[in-house]
C-alpha cells in the first residue's frame, strides 16, 4: 500500500505540490485526475524519487521510502510508466523489456508470460526495434517493461495520451486485469475522465498542486468533476 501525507514539492522557488495526501491500496486503481499543469506528473516524480519532496512523508507497505533513490524505490517495488513512454528506440522489443531486469535478483530476470498474454503484439515483435512500433504499441511496451519488475505499486502517467481508441481499450482491459489479481496497487494519472471513470476505485482530483476532491464513485459527483476539469 502507498501512503502519502502532507507532501510539498518545489522546483526552486516554485511550489508544485501543496500538502498532498494520497493513499493507494493493493488490488485497487487510484486515479489522479486534473487538467494539464496541476501537479499530476510532479506527484509521480515525487513517488518514484525523481524529485525529492520538501515536506511530508511517502511510505510503501509501511516503510518510509522518502530518502531512497529512484533505483532503490524500483527495488522496493515501484514500477513506473512515464508520460511519453520513454522506450529505447534503437533497442528491440525484447531488449526494451529486459531493461526492466535492473532492480531484480538474478533468479528473477526473465520476462513473465503474463505480459504477452496482456499484450500479444509484443510477442510477435520481439525482434523489432522499439522506434518502429506505433505509439500505441510503444505504450504497451512501456507497460510491459514496468511489469517485468513485478511491482507492488504500478504508476501510469497519462497512458492514453496520443493513443488510438482500440489500444486504449486494450490498455484499459490490462489495467482492470492487473487490479483483479490483488498483487499490486495501481495509480493511474489521467486527464480524461471517461477513461478514468471506467477503471477507478477511487479518485483524487488535483488543482494548482492541491487535492481538492477525493473519494469513490459514490462520493465524487460526476457533473462537479467534469466542470472542474473543463475550467
Tell where the protein language model's regions lie, with residue ranges.
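ABC ATPase C-loop
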Residues: 146-147
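Conserved ABC ATPase signature
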Residues: 129-133
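Conserved ABC transporter NBD signature motif
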Residues: 56-63, 76, 108-111, 215
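The feature captures the beta-strand-to-loop junction immediately N-terminal to the Walker
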Residues: 33-35
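Helix-to-loop junction immediately C-terminal to a conserved catalytic motif
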Residues: 48
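Catalytic Walker B motif of ABC-type/P-loop ATPase nucleotide-binding domains
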Residues: 154-158
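Helical segment within the ABC ATPase nucleotide-binding domain
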Residues: 169-183
Amino acid at each position: 500500500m502507498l501512503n502519502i501525507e502532507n507532501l510539498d514539492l518545489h522546483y526552486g522557488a516554485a511550489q508544485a505540490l501543496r500538502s498532498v495526501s494520497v493513499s493507494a491500496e493493493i488490488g485497487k486503481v487510484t486515479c489522479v485526475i486534473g487538467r494539464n499543469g496541476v501537479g499530476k506528473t510532479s506527484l509521480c516524480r515525487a513517488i518514484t524519487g525523481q524529485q525529492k519532496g520538501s515536506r511530508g512523508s511517502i511510505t510503501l507497505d509501511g516503510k518510509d521510502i522518502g530518502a531512497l533513490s529512484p533505483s532503490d524505490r524500483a527495488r522496493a517495488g515501484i514500477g513506473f510508466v512515464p508520460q511519453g513512454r520513454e522506450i529505447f528506440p534503437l533497442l528491440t522489443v525484447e531488449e526494451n523489456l529486459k531493461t526492466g531486469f535492473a532492480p531484480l535478483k538474478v533468479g528473477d530476470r526473465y520476462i513473465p508470460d503474463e505480459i504477452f498474454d496482456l499484450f500479444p503484439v509484443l510477442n510477435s515483435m520481439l525482434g523489432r526495434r522499439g522506434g518502429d512500433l506505433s505509439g500505441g504499441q510503444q505504450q504497451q511496451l512501456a507497460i510491459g517493461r514496468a511489469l517485468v519488475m513485478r511491482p507492488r505499486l504500478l504508476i501510469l502517467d497519462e497512458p492514453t495520451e496520443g493513443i488510438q481508441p482500440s489500444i486504449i481499450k486494450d490498455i484499459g482491459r490490462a489495467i482492470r486485469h492487473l487490479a483483479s489479481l490483488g498483487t499490486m496497487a495501481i495509480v493511474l494519472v489521467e486527464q480524461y475522465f471517461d477513461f478514468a471513470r471506467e477503471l477507478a476505485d477511487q479518485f483524487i482530483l488535483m488543482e494548482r498542486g492541491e487535492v481538492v476532491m477525493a473519494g469513490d464513485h459514490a462520493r465524487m459527483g460526476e457533473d462537479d468533476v467534469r466542470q472542474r476539469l473543463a475550467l
